[in-house]
Amino acid sequence: MGNVEKRNIIGDRVRVARISANPKVTQLELSARLQIQGVMIGDSTIGKIENGASAVTDIQLLAFAKALNVSVLWLLGIEG
């Protein structure tokens, strides 16, 4: 399929935060957490975000941070 242009910079960290959570959070569970915040992103789209194939809005960025209990700066790779 070749190289696909990355459409976001948070995908890798979303995956890391989701998998390293205790207990681990599935893409389906993350989708439910986002929906509670009014952000409708399905589990298949979360997979695309994690792979860098789908763009993320600022509202979605904030919702991901809240749902995963991490900072926006961490998701953006600005803080360690």
Segments (PLM) and residue ranges:
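DNA major-groove recognition helix of helix-turn-helix/homeodomain DNA-binding modules
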Residues: 57-74
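DNA major-groove recognition helix of helix-turn-helix
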Residues: 34, 50, 60, 79
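A short, Lys/Arg-rich alpha-helix, primarily the initiator
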Residues: 1-23, 29
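Short alpha-helical DNA-recognition segment
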Residues: 22-48
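Short alpha-helical elements of helix-turn-helix
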Residues: 12, 28, 44, 58-61
